[in-house]
Amino acid sequence: MSTSDDIHNTTATGKCPFHQGGHDQSAGAGTTTRDWWPNQLRVDLLNQHSNRSNPLGEDFDYRKEFSKLDYYGLKKDLKALLTESQPWWPADWGSYAGLFIRMAWHGAGTYRSIDGRGGAGRGQQRFAPLNSWPDNVSLDKARRLLWPIKQKYGQKISWADLFILAGNVALENSGFRTFGFGAGREDVWEPDLDVNWGDEKAWLTHRHPEALAKAPLGATEMGLIYVNPEGPDHSGEPLSAAAAIRATFGNMGMNDEETVALIAGGHTLGKTHGAGPTSNVGPDPEAAPIEEQGLGWASTYGSGVGADAITSGLEVVWTQTPTQWSNYFFENLFKYEWVQTRSPAGAIQFEAVDAPEIIPDPFDPSKKRKPTMLVTDLTLRFDPEFEKISRRFLNDPQAFNEAFARAWFKLTHRDMGPKSRYIGPEVPKEDLIWQDPLPQPIYNPTEQDIIDLKFAIADSGLSVSELVSVAWASASTFRGGDKRGGANGARLALMPQRDWDVNAAAVRALPVLEKIQKESGKASLADIIVLAGVVGVEKAASAAGLSIHVPFAPGRVDARQDQTDIEMFELLEPIADGFRNYRARLDVSTTESLLIDKAQQLTLTAPEMTALVGGMRVLGAYFDGSKNGVFTDRVGVLSNDFFVNLLDMRYEWKATDESKELFEGRDRETGEVKYTASRADLVFGSNSVLRAVAEVYASSDAHEKFVKDFVAAWVKVMNLDRFDLL
């Protein structure tokens, strides 16, 4: 323990006493606020991927850069790379095809249709946790092999696009005809923090398949892309794996046929690696020493590479031609009898006991081995439904090829949103239902048409609350993760959205707007719905004494019911929308956390979210006609009353019951109930970060700023799916 004499002594020598000792003095070190308060609201999720982390700057235009790309020159270089074996990571059979297919698959395979997060669209495989997942062992080598090509073409091709294109070229170079390729994935420069990968604290913790239906999780174990290839919890039982396979592939929006095609197609080329015990494998890239330069899993088994490589611990080669496309996967699956065995690393796998040695060794042409399969491969033979599909593909290789081509395209493009976001010369012409297709525009309203429509909407008898509510209901389905939802298409008027409980108040305005659309014939219903919001906001601002113009960009179209996959759109139904003070279930997270989740899906910042909630409350845009959060006696006036009254110390808040979901604000002197609120309201006074923003809008000089900020955030939400405006 230091004494005053110690301090005096160090001072006498000219040394600062506080620069002595071994404490970590680097930025971010020490106990953090998250350590003290682990349940702290994650407002920081709204600050992800800002321009401050982007080395290319906010003016960088990827689509413009991509247009300068020598696309077919790039594909030629990728094709050459496939057979340029490197001594630091030798290629199996002289080809990296299997490795690149796995890289693309595992990049795209993190997508979850339930919340739209994950997927290949941001190039997240470069960052933790995905760069160090147990299921991604050795993919660091695949990415490093691509570096010379990325270096050559620079910013004309993103890492995210390059990963998927490399997988496509690997398939094509192996004799397979792919369905096409759409570029347009833009890189980000830091890990996604908003993706819930699960609560487990240890890698490869087993999850029961039923648990996957209750959470947005896409794998049966923490750190896997899909399922444990040795069967659930290393059971070694092919039949028991069927439920897990259906759950994980189903969470990606894949049906049984697509699932069978993807498993078989992905295992037609390449191999797994389990030359020796996994105890020989070193730390993953995030934990590896600095001199490894971003690589991980260095192995001390033999040479550590080539014939001595260890990845999953499984040692499986499925087909006789592992670098050329074939139907051997199904032929071998049904032709031979399979017995359980173990890899050199001790992992459970199966071997064709009655097969000759027909499988080539990846590095010694003089050696052959028997066909081998994963436990989960045999599920395709022993599960009755999977077997029917597998036998059909066995007898009809062309049907298999077609199914895999389409399923692979879906897998690798599922999180890109509508086809209008695709760029490049190989974009397929066919519209696919999972792309949420839209018809071609048939209206081109003039400025005068828009003025006339605004007058018609204003004279329709709809209130400010109804006008704002219907526009919000239409636009707020957007998900930034997979770019689904939004106002374009007017799917609010279609099933299933028209029947959602959260939209009950909003859809009551639809018949009025549909009548205006039909009578005018000048604009789509989608445009008129958004224009209704414009009219509502402008009226509310005018009532507050401000003359504002809410920007409006026409050009939306109206989708048909047959262009709308009801089952997939059901996943967009919110379990909570704090902007409308709506919550359907109380067994999922906290109300305020779900508000952050919704705001993050809408790509909002904390100030944008705050302005929108405050504005929606005073405009009366709540889903059920309740008064929760309506801290004003001027409903329909775009004022900052929500913030002024929330932060007013004259009121004391108490929960109405033990759930602590609803609260009453009572006058401290009289005890009179003045307001009621939800957690989505009170969080703006409770959370220190959100309160700091709320205090800005509650200030006496903030009304005009608040209105301008509300309008800017409102227009942003209305245009989130207007990719044609980019």
UniProtKB/Swiss-Prot annotation:
Q: Where is this site: Transition state stabilizer?
A: 102
Quote the function comment for this protein: Bifunctional enzyme with both catalase and broad-spectrum peroxidase activity.
**Which sequence ranges are marked TM in the entry?**
none
Gene that produces this protein: katG
Q: Name one GO cellular component term.
A: cytosol
PANTHER family, sorted: CATALASE-PEROXIDASE, HYDROPEROXIDASE I, BIFUNCTIONAL CATALASE-PEROXIDASE
Q: Which Gene3D superfamilies match?
A: 1.10.520.10, Peroxidase, domain 2 (1.10.420.10)
Instruction: Identify the stretch(es) annotated as Disordered.
Output: 1-33
Q: Which GO terms describe its biological process?
A: cellular response to hydrogen peroxide; hydrogen peroxide catabolic process
| Enzymatic class | oxidoreductase
Q: Which reaction does it catalyse?
A: H2O2 + AH2 = A + 2 H2O; 2 H2O2 = O2 + 2 H2O
**Official protein name in the record:** Catalase-peroxidase
Molecular function GO terms recorded: catalase activity; heme binding; metal ion binding
Q: Which InterPro entries match?
A: Catalase_peroxidase, Haem_peroxidase, Haem_peroxidase_sf, Peroxidases_AS, Peroxidases_heam-ligand_BS
Instruction: Kindly give the CDD domains that the UniProt entry links to this protein.
Output: catalase_peroxidase_2
Tell me how the cofactor is bound: Binds 1 heme b (iron(II)-protoporphyrin IX) group per dimer.
